[in-house]
Regions:
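Glycine/Thr-rich beta-alpha phosphate-binding loop at enzyme active sites
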Residues: 89, 96, 117-192, 198-204, ...
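C-terminal extensions of enzymes
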Residues: 1-12, 85-88, 254-347
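Short secondary-structure boundary segments
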Residues: 49, 82, 150, 217-218
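Conserved, mostly hydrophobic/aromatic
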Residues: 48, 70, 120, 205-206, ...
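C-terminal helical cap(s) of enzyme catalytic domains, especially alpha/beta-barrels
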Residues: 162-165, 224-246, 286-301, 345
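Active-site-adjacent pocket scaffolds in enzyme catalytic domains
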Residues: 192-195, 210-279
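Non-catalytic, usually N-terminal nucleic-acid engagement modules in DNA/RNA processing proteins
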Residues: 1-114, 332-347
Length: 347
């Protein structure tokens, strides 16, 4: 079974030639354009509807406009306009927003030319609604994927979604394993998890837990803040001290020999031709980071094809052996092998 990684791209692309890439973009990047058009040429395009970003920023998207942009760009996959939850919402409001999400799924499926390109979003406010909502999607939606949306746990107020560069927690692992298990038991959908390809550690955690598809825009954000991604590891800072999130210690200040050795072996275009650009040019760092994440996805594909045990052995010995997130990896293995449906997880 193929493991998909969609590379995040924008109106001002890192590179125009994307003919060999699966690309993730967002409606919100084209919302104000009179004539939306792509500035790059992708192999395949997954167009997010922008609802998560709008929800976080308190914006309201018009269904007709979202639909118009999607039909104009005609992506290979896209998400009907959905209504994510926000922290502090009462259950009644969450239920109402799910009903609006359901209604839009039907409209998009029956009244647009997007047809089988649709990837419905799954939202749930407790264990029972998770199971029921998966079953509803299975019955009414003609798609091979669904996208995990708002999953309301007891820690929902502290969790903003799967985007960005958040450090994974046991609660997140619980939430994902529960949702993935429910999807597997109640449908034949494959799971897309938004924004989980920000680092090798996150990417492998997602794939190991059963995610079949994810995307990465974090490679660009990390690069802009002076960070590079090392194969099989996490981010390392090579900038001038202006980082505002994640690892901020300079890579060359007492770095481990293994880190430097891993970087020296990098086969990306920048590292082969001129490594010095990594220190001075964010685009060079972005090219490097994108290359690393694509290579990690290839490793995951090869190992999962050989069987779960082969993948687990690799993660044990290579990716998480010396990682500060090893405790999360050990917890993920427990949840993968001994899945539980916890009443405590959902309120």
């Amino acid at each position: 079974m193929s493991m998909l990684l969609w590379v995040g791209e924008q109106k001002r692309p890192l590179t125009v030639d994307r003919k060999s890439d699966l690309v993730m973009d967002s409606v919100i990047n084209y919302y104000g354009d009179e004539k939306p058009r792509l500035a790059y040429d992708p192999k395949k395009l997954f167009l997010d509807n922008g609802a998560f970003t709008a929800n976080m920023q308190g914006l309201r998207l018009k269904a007709e406009r979202v639909m118009q942009i999607q039909e104009t760009l005609l992506p290979d996959k896209t998400i009907p306009l959905d209504f994510p939850f926000r922290a502090g919402m009462p259950t009644k409001q969450m239920k109402n927003r799910w009903q609006k999400t359901r209604a839009n799924i039907i409209v998009w499926q029956d009244s647009t030319k997007l047809g089988k390109r649709l990837v419905p979003a799954l939202h749930a406010w407790n264990k029972k609604s998770l199971e029921n909502n998966v079953r509803w999607l299975q019955k009414h939606v003609d798609s091979d994927f669904l996208a995990l949306g708002s999953l309301v746990s007891a820690r929902f107020a502290e969790f903003g979604g799967f985007f960005g560069d958040r450090t994974p927690t046991r609660d997140l692992i619980d939430m994902l394993s529960l949702a993935i298990k429910s999807v597997q038991q109640n449908s034949d959908f494959r799971v897309h998890l938004m924004g989980f390809g920000s680092s090798p550690l996150m990417l492998h955690l997602g794939y190991y837990l059963g995610v079949a598809s994810t995307d990465s825009s974090g490679y660009r954000r990390k690069a802009a803040y002076g960070k590079i991604i090392l194969p099989g590891m996490g981010e390392r800072y090579v900038g001038d001290g202006s980082a505002t999130f994640g690892c901020q210690r300079n890579f060359f200040d007492g770095q481990r020999e293994s880190d430097l050795s891993m970087w020296e072996k990098c086969g990306c275009q920048v590292c082969i031709t001129n490594k010095d650009l990594i220190m001075t040019d964010w685009k060079a760092r972005a090219i490097h980071n994108e290359f690393v994440m694509k290579e990690e996805a290839k490793v995951a594909q090869a190992l999962t094809s050989a069987g779960l045990q082969a993948y687990e052995t690799y993660l044990n010995n290579q990716v998480f052996a010396n990682s500060s997130l090893k405790f999360i990896w050990e917890y993920a293995k427990l949840r993968r092998k001994y899945p539980r449906i916890s009443e405590v997880l959902f309120r």
